[in-house]
């Protein structure tokens, strides 16, 4: 399954708590879509959020964000995991 890192540039006011809630919404929405959100990272100072997801395509990954909470990614990169 392809692995993607997506980036959200949300700006001021982003909190770890808000992102945790959005991630839980992703997990509740991803079922049956062959999408698996794995981890996320938050930089509160820059308002950036990074999500790691297994999905058949970038669009499939972003569709979960769209349907779960509407916060679609600004950028999505297919990545390979290293040691």
Locations of regions flagged by a protein language model:
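Short S/T/G/P-rich N-terminal loop/turn motif that feeds into the first structured element of a domain
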Residues: 1-31, 36-38, 42-47, 81-83
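Short hydrophobic/aromatic beta-strand micro-patches
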Residues: 9, 52-54
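An amphipathic, aromatic/His-enriched active-site/gating alpha helix that lines ligand/cofactor pockets
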Residues: 30-32, 54-82
């Amino acid at each position: 399954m392809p692995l993607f890192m997506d980036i959200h540039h949300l700006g001021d006011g982003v909190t770890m708590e808000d992102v945790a809630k959005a991630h839980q919404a992703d997990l509740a929405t991803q079922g049956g879509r062959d999408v698996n959100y794995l981890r996320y990272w938050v930089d509160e100072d820059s308002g950036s959020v990074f999500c790691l997801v297994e999905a058949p395509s970038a669009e499939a990954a972003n569709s979960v964000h769209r349907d779960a909470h509407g916060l679609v990614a600004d950028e999505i990169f297919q990545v390979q995991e290293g040691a």
